[in-house]
Amino acid sequence: MPRRRVAAKREILDDPKYGSLILAKFMNHVMESGKKAVAERIVYGALDKVKERKNGDPLEVFEKALDAIAPLVEVKSRRVGGATYQVPVEVRPSRRNALAMRWLVDAARKRGEKSMALRLAGELLDAFEGKGAAVKKREDVHRMAEANKAFSHYRF
């Protein structure tokens, strides 16, 4: 057990444009080297592109895309008698969102468009339609969990 006290959770303020807490957290995932203004410009630019293409509420598209990426189960390694098993476990809601955001940003960074805002917009729209690299990542994780269902009795 750790000897120190558990660090207090920092409160994240809602983003200024849409007033959404989840969008503010997403900006923190996009941010590199503490450059929040750059991250805001990228995210708002991406949402503007989504609004142009979808003619709807970009925040709704963002939330549905995140939901399409968020995993329900994942595998954790568990060592039992010299053998390591991949044990499927349910994902906590906070971790679901964190993984979805991480996978979305990673998939966007690997895309080929010119600017990060365009990449992010493209990945958001793909995820909204149930395709794209981030959704593929989720399906791979679910497939791994399904393949290792036999070891689910080794729960943590």
Swiss-Prot record:
Q: Which Gene3D superfamilies match?
A: Ribosomal protein S7 domain
Molecular function in Gene Ontology = rRNA binding; structural constituent of ribosome; tRNA binding
Database matches in Pfam families: Ribosomal_S7
A single Gene Ontology biological process assigned to it is: translation
Q: Which GO cellular component terms, listed alphabetically, does the Swiss-Prot or TrEMBL entry include? A: small ribosomal subunit
Q: Which UniProt keywords apply?
A: Ribonucleoprotein, Ribosomal protein, RNA-binding, rRNA-binding, tRNA-binding
SUPFAM superfamilies per record: Ribosomal protein S7
> Which cysteine pairs make disulfide bonds?
none
Q: Per its UniProt record, what PROSITE patterns does this chain match?
A: RIBOSOMAL_S7
| Similarity comment | Belongs to the universal ribosomal protein uS7 family.
Assembly notes: Part of the 30S ribosomal subunit. Contacts proteins S9 and S11.
Q: What does this protein do?
A: One of the primary rRNA binding proteins, it binds directly to 16S rRNA where it nucleates assembly of the head domain of the 30S subunit. Is located at the subunit interface close to the decoding center, probably blocks exit of the E-site tRNA.
Q: What is this protein called?
A: Small ribosomal subunit protein uS7
Q: Which species expresses this protein natively?
A: Stutzerimonas stutzeri (strain A1501) (Pseudomonas stutzeri)
Whichever gene encodes this chain, its name is: rpsG
